[in-house]
Swiss-Prot record:
Record localization: Cell membrane
Its membrane topology: Multi-pass membrane protein
Top-level taxonomy: Bacteria, Bacillati, Bacillota, Bacilli, Bacillales
Gene that produces this protein: atpI
Organism from which the protein derives: Priestia megaterium (strain ATCC 12872 / QMB1551)
Sequence intervals crossing the membrane: 15-35, 36-53, 72-92, 97-117
Protein name from the UniProt record: ATP synthase protein I
Amino acid sequence: MQDLQHVFPRLRSYILYLLALYVLGWGFTSYKAVFAGLILGTALSLYNLWNLVRKFEQFGQALDEGKKPRSIGTVVRFATAALAVVITISYPKTFHIISVVVGLMTYYVVIIIDLVVQNMRRR
């Protein structure tokens, strides 16, 4: 498997392309709340991906140095999801809750699709 540090720029660019599409959808359609929710969720998803890569790097360094590794940031990811829900509940006319949740799951889907595509290219 490729090192996460090498994969992260590719995943980040995919997510940024999705964000650009969502911004276009927000600007040119009447589904503003849905696209605003996707933008919010996907932006926080990108933060979660960046945090995950950073935590995995720290985890690997701790193992290499023989130290006890720290957590990989599960609490931070849960807190990010809670923040998204609080923002969505605070502004229900601006953000659509289901699209925020879908946006939060974006980086998982992007990772899986990238893994499948990269495995197909190697064959």
